[in-house]
């Protein structure tokens, strides 16, 4: 299981399964694999399913 951190908003970032403290910083991205970082963005929200 990959560990995804909350990026931006919890509701928008489905990729982040483990919802930890979402920082207010917008630059806060999912700290995991390259896919996770991409999945964090709304454009890649659909790709989050795989991860």
Curated annotation (Swiss-Prot):
Keywords: Chromosome, Developmental protein, Differentiation, DNA condensation, DNA-binding, Nucleosome core, Nucleus, Spermatogenesis. Testis. GO terms for cellular component: nucleosome; nucleus. GO terms for biological process: chromosome condensation; sperm DNA condensation. One of its GO terms (molecular function) is DNA binding. The keyword Disulfide bond does not apply. It comes from the Eukaryota. InterPro entries: Protamine_P1. It is found in: Nucleus; Chromosome. It holds the Pfam family Protamine_P1. Belongs to the protamine P1 family. Protamines substitute for histones in the chromatin of sperm during the haploid phase of spermatogenesis. They compact sperm DNA into a highly condensed, stable and inactive complex. This is Sperm protamine P1. It comes from Piliocolobus badius. The gene is PRM1.
């Amino acid at each position: 299981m990959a560990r995804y951190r909350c990026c931006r908003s919890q509701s928008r970032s489905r990729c982040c399964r483990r919802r930890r403290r979402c920082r207010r910083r917008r630059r806060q991205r999912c700290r995991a694999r390259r896919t996770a970082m991409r999945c964090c963005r709304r454009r890649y929200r659909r790709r989050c399913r795989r991860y």
